[in-house]
């Protein structure tokens, strides 16, 4: 039987309080205590901790017919953010999202891809400028997701097939070393499909098809992106049937 220390229990309770507020904005201390079956003093302690870490904030007072109106709490949605980069042959799209998946800012950078030190230097400076303009502090960035046109290893660490960018075998370490935050490759169509799921959480089963200069797609099953053991299940791609076309 797994044993939990007092510290483990406190961390779990703190996490539970935060996630309850995340899912139930404008909730009261009593709401949290009732929902999580913990004491009011315990909730108060965790609220103080989360406020001191600037992860939550008071957002007014709740209406009450008797007595003092209770404080309402919500998370600070941009206390932590994620950066998304779409790497294309001749441009790079960059955006930032908050903890609810809502876009904060976006920009298109005229940075053409090439597997060189010069490219990574340009990209790093462009991302740093984007973060500075939009007041994104380094410590608030949870990580960077890189949407690419190609097949990705199951753990997102390698571009296993990248004919469009001519970068098959490229490692995510090239980006992680440049940005010093966790980075991960994601198939571009899966990025778009995941965005649809964030915006429409009631979707259970669906097929996503991206029609542009290149064909792409993904499949949603039971409300989850279908990836399979190799990370390629549900991926829509095209293939050459006749090299150089028919005569």
What are these regions (language model features)?
Residues 1-29, 33-34:
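Extreme N-terminal segment that seeds HTH/winged-HTH DNA-binding domains in transcriptional regulators
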Residues 32, 61, 108, 163-164, ...:
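Short clusters of small/polar residues that mark proteolytic maturation junctions
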Residues 4, 83-117, 159, 232-236, ...:
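Short glycine-rich, Thr/Ser-proximal phosphate-binding strand/loop in the N-terminal lobe
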Residues 201-247:
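Glycine-rich phosphate-binding loop of actin/hexokinase-like ATP-binding domains
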Residues 69-106, 208-225:
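Gly/Thr-rich phosphate-binding beta-strand-loop-beta motif of the actin/hexokinase/Hsp70
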Residues 58-80, 185-208:
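Conserved phosphate-binding catalytic cores of ATP/NTP-utilizing and phosphoryl-transfer enzymes
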